[in-house]
């Protein structure tokens, strides 16, 4: 089916199958559509709300066109959020990735520049001295040797440049805001995925099943695309093609409720100071608790099932300052 027919289908309010969506997004990524066509397509998908098939197709096209990452045969994870929750918190998932790796897990973190916050994963890592533009081979070497690497979305998904001007002009959430966490070019074994809106938990979970994720958590924490300590966290656990929905509270992690305000970050430079202090064992207790809760759930994917024990282990590890050594090693690649 030609692009125009697929677009016409969207304009008339009909949804696309996975294969149709893959074909249309292939055309977008390969630069075959005009900006006007891309804008119309994104708005049509937004007004009706993209369904699981359409998101799955978009993910498939993104991965088919991505720069190849030499995938290891050992289990590894990603911890990543959609961004766009508008809360301007410190970089919790970036810190959690470094801490988990320092504790022995393997994490290939996929990330980008800031969407809506002042400081996205690549912004803060660059400020910390990490080269986010390493080659896939160098990133793989870091994953092998120190347990963590960063995959900069713009480097692996260069076809997204065709969409960038349209997204900038539209200034609204589109399907591209929700693709990021699902299109890690390393194709991780495990995923901890944060979403900016509660209604995305189910959509994401169903998409993870369609993408045949081995074991994933999708979380939305009372307005955050992370595990929350200021309220409840809605969770979908995807394992062997099945989805289980449940809620986690701070008590489930053995932690007290704390204000969202205590996690406010700022520009990359400010967030860098917070993360450096945290990884050195000199950070704010609220920051340590938030990172401990998120890292605890990430470690559960690796078979460490006791969340409260995981939190205690993470807090002890943070206090030791060893996580900072992992960050220092990451800056050498």
Swiss-Prot record:
Mg(2+) 2 binds at residues 225-226. Anthranilate 2 binds at residue 167. InterPro entries: Anthranilate_Pribosyl_Tfrase, Glycosyl_Trfase_fam3, Glycosyl_Trfase_fam3_N_dom, Glycosyl_Trfase_fam3_N_dom_sf, Nuc_phospho_transferase. One of its GO terms (biological process) is L-tryptophan biosynthetic process. Its EC number is 2.4.2.18. Keywords: Amino-acid biosynthesis, Aromatic amino acid biosynthesis, Glycosyltransferase, Magnesium, Metal-binding, Transferase, Tryptophan biosynthesis. Pathway: Amino-acid biosynthesis; L-tryptophan biosynthesis; L-tryptophan from chorismate: step 2/5. Its cofactor is Mg(2+). Transmembrane segments: none annotated. Mg(2+) 1 binds at residues 93, 226. Anthranilate 1 binds at residues 81, 112. Binds 2 magnesium ions per monomer. GO terms for cellular component: cytosol. It catalyses: N-(5-phospho-beta-D-ribosyl)anthranilate + diphosphate = 5-phospho-alpha-D-ribose 1-diphosphate + anthranilate. GO terms for molecular function: anthranilate phosphoribosyltransferase activity; magnesium ion binding. NCBIfam families: trpD. HAMAP family: TrpD. Homodimer. Catalyzes the transfer of the phosphoribosyl group of 5-phosphorylribose-1-pyrophosphate (PRPP) to anthranilate to yield N-(5'-phosphoribosyl)-anthranilate (PRA). This is Anthranilate phosphoribosyltransferase. It comes from Haemophilus influenzae (strain 86-028NP). The gene is trpD.
């Amino acid at each position: 089916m030609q692009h125009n027919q697929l677009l016409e289908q969207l304009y008339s309010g009909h949804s696309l199958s996975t294969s149709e969506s893959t074909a249309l997004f292939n055309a977008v990524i390969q630069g075959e559509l005009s900006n006007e066509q891309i804008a119309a397509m994104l708005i049509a998908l937004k007004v009706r709300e993209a369904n699981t098939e359409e998101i799955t197709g978009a993910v498939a096209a993104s991965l088919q066109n991505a720069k190849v990452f030499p995938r290891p045969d050992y289990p590894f994870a990603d911890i990543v959020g959609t961004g766009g929750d508008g809360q301007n918190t410190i970089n919790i998932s970036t810190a959690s990735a470094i801490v988990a790796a320092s504790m022995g897990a393997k994490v290939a973190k996929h990330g980008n520049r800031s969407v809506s916050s002042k400081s996205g994963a690549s912004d803060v890592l660059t400020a910390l001295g990490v080269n986010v533009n390493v080659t896939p081979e160098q990133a793989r070497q870091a994953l092998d040797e120190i347990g963590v690497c960063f995959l900069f979305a713009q480097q692996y998904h260069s076809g997204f440049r065709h969409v960038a001007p349209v997204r900038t002009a539209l200034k609204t959430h589109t399907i591209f805001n929700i693709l990021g966490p699902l299109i890690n070019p390393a194709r991780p074994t495990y995923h901890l995925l944060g979403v900016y809106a509660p209604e995305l938990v189910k959509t994401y979970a169903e998409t993870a099943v369609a993408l045949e994720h081995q074991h994933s958590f999708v979380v939305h924490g009372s307005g955050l695309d992370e595990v929350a300590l200021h309220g409840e966290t809605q969770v979908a656990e995807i394992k062997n093609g099945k989805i289980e929905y449940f809620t986690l509270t701070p008590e489930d992690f053995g932690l007290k409720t704390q204000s969202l305000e205590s996690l406010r970050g700022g520009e990359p430079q400010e967030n860098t100071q917070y993360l450096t202090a945290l990884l050195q064992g000199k950070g704010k207790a609220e920051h340590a608790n938030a990172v401990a809760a998120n890292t605890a759930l990430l470690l559960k994917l690796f078979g460490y099932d006791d969340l409260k024990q995981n939190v205690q282990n993470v807090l002890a590890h943070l206090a030791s300052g060893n996580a900072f050594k992992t960050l220092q090693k990451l800056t050498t690649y």
